[in-house]
C-alpha cells in the first residue's frame, strides 16, 4: 500500500545533520556539475544526484521510513533509484537492493530480510512505496539499528538452494572509498543486488567518475554503449567475456576508449583470457576478488595475461588453511540472516574458495564444494572446463561430479556446441581431445550435448545439482 504520513520535521533535521558530517555527502557535492550518471540517453550531474537525494530524504520522512528501518530498493540503476540509495544511506536504513532480474523472488527475499518498506521502480523511473506490517526481530538487524549504522543485505544467487542473506555495515563497506582514486567512465554491468554492482556504483560516484547504464546486457548493447559513451572501464565476468568473443562483437564496434577490464565472480579459464587479450591488445585485464560476505578486496594481477593475483593487505588479513582461503577484516559481513555463522573463534571468515599459492600470488581454483572425488582422486571442474573450451565448435561447457557406484563420482560434462554437429561425433571428438591432455580419471565419463545457456542473470556459470543425463552406452573412460 502507498503510505502518506505528514512531514516529520525532526527526522528531516536529523537527516540533514547526519548528511552534513558524512564524508561521502561532502565528496559528492564537491563534484558539482560533473556527469555522475548516464541512463537512457539522459545525463545526471552530481549536483542533480544530490538534489535527488535530498528530495528522497523528504519522501522517506513523509512515508514514515525512520532510521534503522529495513528498506528494499527494487529495480535497476536509474537516476532516481541511485538517489534513493544515497538517501537511504544518509537515513541510516538497512538497505535491501533487489534487481529487476530477480523480480519473481522479491516477495520471498523481502520476507527473509524482514523488509518493512519497499520502493519499486518501473522502467521509466517512476516509483511507488509499499509498507509492511513486519517486525524486525533478527539480532543482526536490531544491532545495526541500535548502533545507528546503515546496513546492507545481499543475497547469494541461490543456485544450489535458498539464497543466503549476508548482513553488512554499509559505512564500513564504503570506508575504503574515502581514499581518493582515479576516476573513470564506467559501465555498470553487474546487477544492483550483486556486491560487484554496488562496488562499481560507489567507486564511480566516490571518485568523481561517470556511471553509464545499459538496458540490456547483450554483447551488442554493451559494445554499443562502450563505443557511444567512450567507456574506459568495464567490470564483468569471464562468462560474459567469452560471450563477447563468440558473438564477434569486439570486432564490430569501436572499443578504442576501453582501458581496463576487470573480471571476477568466478574463475577465469586461461584459454578465454588468452583469446580476449588477443582481441583487445591495448586493454589491461585485472582479476578482482570478492564475495557478498566480504565486499571487493584490493588485488593486483601478476600481469594482464595471468590468472594469478596478489591480495592487498589494506584493512584485511588473509591466510590459507588446507588449501582454503580465509579472510579477516572489519568490513566483513556481520553474519547471515538465515544460516550459521561462518566465522571461527578469532573472527576469520572461511571463504570456501580453494586456492593455489605461488610466492605472494594465489590462483582461485574454485569452490571447495564443487570438488569431484573420483575414487579418491580430487578433480576440480574448472580444470576440465578450461580444456574442453579449447575443443573446436564448443560454445560453452559446465563440468560437475555425478554419483557413481564404483568410484563414488565421475566427471560429467554438459556441452553446448557453437554450430550444428551430430552429438555423437562431438562427444567422440571431445574424448579424443581429452585423451592427449588429461589423466584418464579426469576425462568426462558422461557427456550431454545441449542447446541452452549455462549461466543466469548474473552471467556466472550455474552449477545446479541436476544430474547430467548419461547416454545408454556410457563408458566411464573411453
Language model: regions and residue ranges:
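Conserved AMP-binding A3 loop
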Residues: 45-47, 143, 148-178
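Conserved ATP/PPi-binding loop(s) of AMP-dependent carboxylate-activating enzymes
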Residues: 319-346, 377-379
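Flexible lysine-rich "adenylation lid" loop at the C-terminal edge of ANL adenylation domains
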Residues: 438, 444, 450-478
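AMP-binding/adenylate-forming catalytic core of the ANL superfamily
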Residues: 73, 234, 329, 352-442, ...
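Conserved AMP-binding/adenylate-forming
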Residues: 58-101, 191, 378, 417
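Conserved AMP-binding/adenylation subdomain of ANL enzymes
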Residues: 174-185, 193-233
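Gly/Ser/Thr-rich phosphate-binding loop
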Residues: 233, 247-305
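Conserved AMP-binding/adenylate-forming core of the ANL superfamily
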Residues: 25, 33-64, 72, 107, ...
